Amino acid sequence: MREQVIVGAGLSGMVAAINLAREGYSVTVRERRDRVGGLTDIIGLEGRVINIGDGTPINLERMSAYTGIDISPVAVPLERCMNHLYGRTYEVEFYEGVPAYLVERGPRPTSIDVYLYELARMEGVEFSFSDTVTDFVSLPPDSIIATGLFGEAWKPLGVPHLAVYGYLAMGETDEADPKVVIYFDEYTRDYAFYSQVNSARGACLFSRGKPLDVDVKDRFRKQLAENDGIEFDQWDAVSMGALPVETWRNPRLFAKNYILAGTLSGTMDPFLLFGVHGALVSGKIAAMAVSDHQAALEEFNRVNKYYRQGYLFAWAYQKMPLWFLQHVTWFGIRNYPWLAPLMKERVFKMLPGFARI
């Protein structure tokens, strides 16, 4: 039985592990944390867990057929989203032909992380926790590296990236319904959001490439309280790791002698930074690459077909004059109700694999 090492027990790493175990491999997943979704050592959140909702457009049936994994038990339908865009508010109901879902991230039994972990264990995957890999040279060739936003893999493997900075607040709520609130405002050329699912709630304000001043956090905090009635007792300044959005050439399936998966591979939307869909898809492709580099590379390039277009759009968005940016954003959200049925899945064509699996 051939052995396979996977570094990182995130979504892509566990999807790869499940698929390889089903193919007869003896799979070991090495994870730096003490458990799946466990205590983190990232700057600003040392010794705490990240328990928050993560939203994504996704066709569950297609994803299940593609990856061999049905995540519907932990995917909560999201019907609408409140958007505060440069001083204007729009509540958007998602077009039914392009469904959106929230998944919980973290160590609780209701999270997608724990769900995939339990599936992996059922397939015979072994996990080695509190096992930080710093010497990648010691890993066997074709090891799968799926270390996500956080970790030491970016520089040793030569993957272009931008550091991400921001503020994060987390807590619990008695409200049963899932909820997402989005803010686009002049204080960041990225965005801020609030999400709640399975009673876990969190808010995040971030910026790629440069830190945000504390007064920016205070402004977002005030907006949430006044506009949405949402408050948190504690906000933490956080170094959020890195994103694969430094160059239009970021997506890569291989680095040195290794196979990349998830965020590290660049399989994500470079504009809105949706990551769940790409993580699941790239985990499957990484598993394919273990036995067939060429076929996996062709599939990787196919699902990431629109990354360059998305990168250029994100670059332009970052550089636009504020007045023009406001009008572009308002136009897009106002016209979503008729554009979405017209464009259907093309609305999210920059999302890796969306409408292509």
Task: Give short role names for the model-derived ranges.
Residues R2-V29:
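N-terminal Rossmann-like FAD-binding beta1-loop-alpha1 element of flavoenzymes
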Residues N19, G38-L85, Y165:
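N-terminal FAD cofactor-binding segment of flavoenzymes
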Residues V29-R33, T263:
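Conserved acidic E/D residue at the C-terminus of a beta-strand in Rossmann-like folds
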Residues N51-I58, Y95-E118, P211-V216:
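Short beta-strand to alpha-helix junction loop
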Residues V76, L212-S291, A295:
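FAD/FMN-dependent oxidoreductases across multiple families
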Residues T110, V114-F232, G266:
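Predominantly flavin-linked oxidoreductase catalytic cores and closely associated redox partners
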Residues M288-H327:
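Active-site-proximal substrate-binding core of FAD-dependent oxidoreductases
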Residues A316-I357:
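C-terminal auxiliary extensions adjacent to catalytic cores
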